[in-house]
């Protein structure tokens, strides 16, 4: 309709109408492509896809955390209470850009971040609780698909992200000054993190595919009825893409959760470490009263990281 209206503009109607019709066809092709891609997922359509993209716009704003100390605001990495989304006995789900600081007794301790939005007490991610959540998620998605209300369920899920109904289990404070980048900062560590951005994709997919047989046994032994019902329903209706998504989702939460790409990156780092130049120190020649001598103490902050101290 908009393209037809553009065509009635005097003098420039013909070229504008053609351009508007071409643009409308491009938008329709893009919409059909997104509908085809998201149609294999439960409760997804183009409108839900756009709402999900719009909901991601609030993430950068939540990545700045401040601490009020005697009326003075300090930028900190410690999560405030408003950033805590969900808590279990050993896991805290929080907004990105911070690390939970939990007070236990008379001492505060930084929890170990295992993901940008997940922190655990000791760095180990318990799989039992996460698999129960996946069981509930898959069961709800199966029910929505069976009742043909997938768009409604997706809308309710997006709106539900604005509200949190979870009792507090831990006392979170902002007096730890936690580090988002835990551990000793080295060149190999930074190289490992950079490799994590591109290397683990194929390894992660292959690892999840290889864990599917064990995941099927865990579904039956652990009585995960929501996942079993989802696999059975999607298999009966012939939607094998959803069956594969459910299997990969359940297999991704292994009993001993670890970063598969991290292991591959560590192996690569072990091989490349043989070619490491090791510690070094820049030597500078200083001219004092016409005589040259070596100044071995002329180090800046960046050079001191390479001396091995």
From Swiss-Prot:
Looking up InterPro entries in the UniProt record yields: HCV_Core_C, HCV_Env, HCV_NS1
* Glycosylated residues, chain numbering: 68, 81, 106, 177, 289, 295, 302
GO MF annotation: an example: structural molecule activity
Q: Which residues cross the membrane?
A: 41-61, 231-251
Q: Which domain of life is it from?
A: Viruses
Q: Where along the sequence does the record put site: Cleavage?
A: 49-50, 63-64, 255-256
Spans within the Cytoplasmic topological domain: 1-40
Segments in the Lumenal topological domain: 62-230, 252-309
Q: Where is this region: HVR1?
A: 256-282
Per the UniProt entry, the propeptide covers 50-63
**Ribonucleoprotein as UniProt keyword:** yes
A single GO cellular-component term on record = host cell mitochondrial membrane
GO terms, biological process: clathrin-dependent endocytosis of virus by host cell; fusion of virus membrane with host endosome membrane; symbiont-mediated suppression of host innate immune response; virion attachment to host cell
Pfam families, A to Z: HCV_core, HCV_env, HCV_NS1
Region of interest (Important for lipid droplets localization), ranges: 36-39
Which keywords does this chain's UniProt record carry? Apoptosis, Capsid protein, Clathrin-mediated endocytosis of virus by host, Fusion of virus membrane with host endosomal membrane, Fusion of virus membrane with host membrane, Glycoprotein, Host cytoplasm, Host endoplasmic reticulum, Host lipid droplet, Host membrane, Host mitochondrion, Host nucleus, Host-virus interaction, Inhibition of host innate immune response by virus, Interferon antiviral system evasion, Membrane, Oncogene, Ribonucleoprotein, RNA-binding, Transmembrane, Transmembrane helix, Ubl conjugation, Viral attachment to host cell, Viral envelope protein, Viral immunoevasion, Viral nucleoprotein, Viral penetration into host cytoplasm, Virion, Virus endocytosis by host, Virus entry into host cell
Family to which the UniProt record says this protein belongs? Belongs to the hepacivirus polyprotein family.
Fill in the misc note: Viral particle assembly takes place at the surface of ER-derived membranes in close proximity to lipid droplets. NS2 associates with E1/E2 glycoproteins, NS3 and NS5A, which interacts with the viral RNA and core protein to promote genome encapsidation. The nucleocapsid buds at the ER membrane where E1/E2 glycoproteins are anchored and afterward associate with nascent lipid droplet to acquire APOE and APOC. Secretion of viral particles is probably regulated by viroporin p7.
Protein name, UniProt field: Genome polyprotein
Instruction: Provide the species name.
Output: Hepatitis C virus (isolate HCT27)
């Amino acid at each position: 309709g908009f393209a037809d209206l553009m065509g009635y503009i005097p003098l420039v109607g013909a070229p504008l109408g053609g351009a508007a019709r071409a643009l409308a066809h491009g938008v329709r092709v893009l919409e059909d492509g997104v509908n085809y891609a998201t149609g294999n997922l439960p409760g997804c359509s183009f409108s839900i896809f756009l709402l999900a993209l719009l909901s991601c716009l609030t993430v950068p704003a939540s990545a700045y955390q401040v601490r009020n100390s005697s009326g003075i605001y300090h930028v900190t990495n410690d999560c405030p209470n408003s950033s805590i989304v969900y808590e279990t006995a050993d896991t805290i789900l929080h907004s990105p850009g911070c690390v939970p600081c939990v007070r236990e007794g008379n001492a505060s301790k930084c929890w170990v971040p295992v993901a940008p939005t997940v922190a655990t007490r000791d760095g180990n991610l318990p799989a039992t609780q996460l698999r129960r959540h996946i069981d509930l998620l898959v069961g709800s998605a199966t029910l929505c698909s069976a009742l043909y209300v997938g768009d409604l369920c997706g809308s309710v899920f997006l709106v539900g992200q604005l509200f949190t109904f979870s009792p507090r289990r831990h006392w979170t404070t902002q007096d730890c000054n936690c580090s988002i980048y835990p551990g000793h900062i080295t060149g190999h560590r930074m190289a490992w993190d950079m490799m994590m951005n591109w290397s683990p994709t194929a390894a992660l997919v292959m690892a999840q595919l290889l864990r599917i047989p064990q995941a099927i046994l865990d579904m039956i032994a652990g009585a995960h009825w929501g996942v079993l019902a989802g696999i059975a329903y999607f298999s009966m209706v012939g939607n094998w893409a959803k069956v594969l998504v459910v299997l990969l989702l359940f297999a991704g939460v292994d009993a001993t959760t670890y970063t598969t790409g991290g292991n591959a990156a560590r192996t690569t780092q072990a091989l490349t470490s043989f070619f490491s130049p090791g510690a070094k120190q820049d030597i500078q020649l200083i001219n004092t009263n016409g005589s040259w001598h070596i100044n071995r103490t002329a180090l800046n902050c960046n050079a001191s990281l390479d001396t091995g101290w």
